Swiss-Prot record:
Upper lineage: Eukaryota, Fungi, Dikarya, Ascomycota, Pezizomycotina
Ranges of biased composition (kind: Basic and acidic residues): 21-36
Membrane topology of this protein: Multi-pass membrane protein
Name of the molecule in the record: MFS-type transporter acdC
Molecular function as annotated in GO: transmembrane transporter activity
Length: 507
């Protein structure tokens, strides 16, 4: 039984305050005490979601990844339409980054609704309900008569789109065993970061074409409907408590034994419990936990830089290099994309080698082992930032390649940082991630608001240099917690104590 859960972009979907990934373990203590409790018929129960075929599991993984990619794509796609939108509505270009920021703020608040719903009704209902409304809100953006309509609808795009973002990691934990999850989850979360990179590239070409900027929303609607319907056909309900509740209902009808019940029938969370788990306890943990505070600040910087560069790249390439075609000016984002792909390889390779070796030799892996990849790649992000800034007056290819180390750092640091928080807080990881998500999204979402002014006033070189120095200041964090993390955990009331390990690795 593993106490781990995969990393999450905007908050993990919980499992009744138990760790994700535990659902395959039968509740033996309940079975012994009460024969009316409906549970799995052992680990090989054919209805258990982890016993789906590998083909079906990969189909579920890539279906959800496709959905989340288009959700995050929508957050950045309007970043390249600043000038045509501001000209059409006769407003200042300075307000346009708000169209991106409001989506990210929606990403922060949405999981407060979707995560509790996934505990009560399972994964499918909140995922597809939210995704459907997310798609519908593309229509008023596409036909908006004024800027206010765009801004309001963009916020709700984030709120409803966050359903798949927040519930998706729970699905990964439901269907994959801890070892295989180490291969599947990097692909899922890479799709979350791929969307914001593709947004300005595809959006730039659409904006420059005869279709115009409004077709960025129409394209999002069309692709969302296609991949949403595909996922609706492929993705089943995977949340064990709800599946057992459905089994108990079927058995009551078949046997006429009304005494049969499932765990969820008797332990349905209350509104007060949800409020404590997602509001009160996250707030207390954020104030009292040095691990949570430090990693939230670090991950907020990473998240903010990703979205800040949506405004910085147009300054560096469209304005400074006079690339007038917005689609062409967005192609340098491919450098970051290449770096993220390399980051996936780094995580998977280390999972199948170093982590597997530790697990085989020791039977468990300490949470601090997550930080090895962070330590190795922590310098790549500042290298990418310094490189990007001081290559502003060199050949464009030199500046584009700077995105490779930047992409490696963004992906590996973010993913392993989130995994470390989950491993450290285990059964309370939902509260820790809720605190991290709120702070990270609000702090990171504010970066696009000052990005353009910062790069205009300081120049590409010095603006990137300042960000580079800030990221250098964050480099000691994984090193410090790798050395002192066990001692800090020993003093905490919320974390795994010193000496405790975690089960099979799940990066």
């Amino acid at each position: 039984m593993s106490p781990n859960a995969p990393a999450v972009d905007i908050g993990a979907a919980p499992s009744l305050d138990t760790p994700e990934g535990d659902t395959k373990q039968p509740a033996e203590d309940h079975v012994e005490k009460d024969s009316n409790l409906v549970d799995w018929d052992g680990p090989d129960d054919p209805e258990h979601p982890q016993n789906l075929t590998r083909l079906r599991k990969w189909g579920i993984t890539f279906s959800l990844a496709s959905m989340t990619m288009w959700i995050t794509f929508s957050s950045s796609v309007l970043s390249v339409a600043t000038h045509p939108i501001s000209e059409e509505y006769n407003v200042s270009t300075k307000v346009m980054p708000l169209a991106t920021t409001l989506v990210i703020f929606g990403f922060a608040l949405g999981p407060l609704c979707w995560a509790p719903l996934s505990e009560l009704y399972g994964r499918r209902l909140p995922t597809f309900l939210g995704y459907g409304v997310f798609a519908i809100f593309q229509v008023p953006v596409a036909v908006a008569p004024n800027l206010q309509t765009i801004m309001v609808c963009r916020f709700f795009v984030g709120v409803f789109g966050s359903s798949a973002l927040s519930v998706g990691p729970g699905v990964m934990a439901d269907i994959w065993d801890p070892v295989d999850r180490g291969i599947a989850t990097p692909f899922f979360f890479a799709a979350n970061l791929l969307g914001p990179i593709l947004g300005p590239i595809i959006g730039g070409f659409i904006t420059e074409s005869q279709l115009g900027w409004r077709w960025t929303a129409w394209l999002t609607l069309i692709t969302s409907i296609f991949f949403g319907v595909l996922a609706l056909l492929i993705v089943p309900e995977t949340y064990s408590p709800v599946l057992l509740q459905q089994r108990a209902s079927r058995l009551r009808r078949a046997t006429q034994n009304q005494s049969l019940y499932s765990f969820l029938d008797q332990h349905r969370p209350t509104l007060a419990e949800f409020g404590y788990k997602y509001l009160a306890r996250p707030f207390m943990m954020f104030l009292l936990e040095p691990i949570l505070i430090c990693f939230t600040v670090y991950l907020s910087l990473i998240y903010g830089i990703l979205y800040l560069f949506l405004e910085a790249y147009p300054v560096a390439f469209a304005e400074e290099r006079h690339w007038t075609n917005k689609g062409i000016a967005g192609l340098p984002f491919l450098g970051i994309l290449v770096g993220m792909v390399l980051g996936i390889g780094i995580i998977i390779y280390n999972t199948r080698t170093r982590f597997a070796r530790h697990l085989a030799e020791q039977g468990q892996v300490a949470p601090e082992e997550r930080l090895v990849e962070m330590m190795l790649t922590s310098i790549t992000m500042p290298i990418g930032l310094f490189w990007f800034g001081w290559a502003a007056h060199t050949h464009w290819m030199v500046q584009t390649i700077a995105g490779v180390p930047l992409g490696i750092g963004l992906f590996v640091l973010f993913m392993q940082g989130m995994n470390y928080l989950i491993d450290v807080y285990l059964t309370l990881s939902n509260s820790a991630i809720a605190a991290n998500t709120l702070a990270r999204s609000f702090l990171g979402g504010s970066f696009p608001l000052f990005a353009t002014a910062m790069y205009h006033n300081l120049g590409v070189d010095w603006a990137s240099t300042i960000l580079g120095f800030i990221s250098v200041a964050m480099v000691p964090i994984p090193f410090a917690f790798y050395i002192f993390g066990a001692r800090i955990r020993a003093m905490s009331r919320y974390t795994v104590k010193a000496g405790n390990g975690i089960g099979p690795p799940i990066p």
